[in-house]
From Swiss-Prot:
Family: In the N-terminal section; belongs to the bradykinin-potentiating peptide family.
Localization of this protein: Secreted
Pfam families (UniProt xref): ANP (PF00212)
Disulfide bridge partners, by residue number: 165-181
Name recorded for this polypeptide: Bradykinin potentiating and C-type natriuretic peptides
Coiled-coil blocks: none
Function in brief: Bradykinin-potentiating peptide both inhibits the activity of the angiotensin-converting enzyme (ACE) and enhances the action of bradykinin by inhibiting the peptidases that inactivate it. It acts as an indirect hypotensive agent. Synthetic Cdt1a, Cdt1b and the short hexapeptide Cdt3 are able to potentiate the hypotensive effect mediated by Bk on the blood pressure of anesthetized rats.
In-chain residues carrying the UniProt-annotated modification Pyrrolidone carboxylic acid: 28, 31, 44, 53
Main location class: secreted
Example of a GO biological process term: receptor guanylyl cyclase signaling pathway
Lineage top rank: taxon: Eukaryota
Record's keyword terms, sorted: Cleavage on pair of basic residues, Disulfide bond, Hypotensive agent, Metalloenzyme inhibitor, Metalloprotease inhibitor, Protease inhibitor, Pyrrolidone carboxylic acid, Secreted, Signal, Toxin, Vasoactive, Vasodilator
Tissue: Venom gland.
Length: 181
């Protein structure tokens, strides 16, 4: 009977595993493996959360700061604002009127700053699209001629497109008259 080399080597390996290096048969482990005694894990007793005060939050008092900022600058300073009518003989109407911020500190200044920082505007997207695919004008369709794109060139782009290889102007269909560029 023919036994393949792979099966024969597998049987030989199994026979050798049953015999220790000394040539004696292996004993079954009646004892545990030798190891250090590790104490069991200690159960942690966590403290219950304490009652928070009304103006305190787990994040370290940010709620109190938020309340002070929402009340206005006089709450943050804990002093009444000194204005033109906030002197020693201030009227009741001036004290009852809410304090208004100047126009430079209003919503317009905030929106202008955020508008300058915005990078996803329509103009930025258009410029990025032209940078990514500069050969867009060579696609079919669009203008009066054969291969013009949907966008007509304006301004400096139109002037740049009109220049030939040696600074000579191209004719209307975009071919150089006999220069072979």
């Amino acid at each position: 009977m023919f036994v393949s080399r792979l099966a024969a080597s597998g049987l030989l390996l199994l026979a050798l595993l049953a015999v220790s290096l000394d040539g004696k048969p292996l004993q079954q482990w009646s004892q545990r493996w030798p190891h250090l005694e590790i104490p069991p894990l200690v159960v942690q007793n966590w403290k219950s959360p304490t009652q928070l005060q009304a103006r305190e939050s787990p994040a370290g008092g940010t709620t109190a700061l938020r309340e002070e900022l929402s009340l206005g600058p006089e709450a943050a300073l804990d002093t009444p604002p000194a204005g033109p009518d906030g002197g020693p003989r201030g009227s009741k109407a001036a004290a009852a009127a809410p304090q208004r911020l100047s126009k430079s500190k209003g919503a317009s200044a905030t929106s202008a700053a955020s508008r300058d920082l915005r990078t996803d505007g329509k103009q930025a997207r258009q410029n990025w699209g032209r940078l990514v695919s500069p050969d867009h004008h060579s696609a079919a369709g669009g203008g009066c001629g054969g291969g013009g794109g949907a966008r007509r060139l304006k301004g400096l782009a139109k002037k740049r497109a009109g220049n030939g290889c040696f600074g000579l102007k191209l004719d209307r269909i975009g071919s150089m008259s006999g220069l072979g560029c």
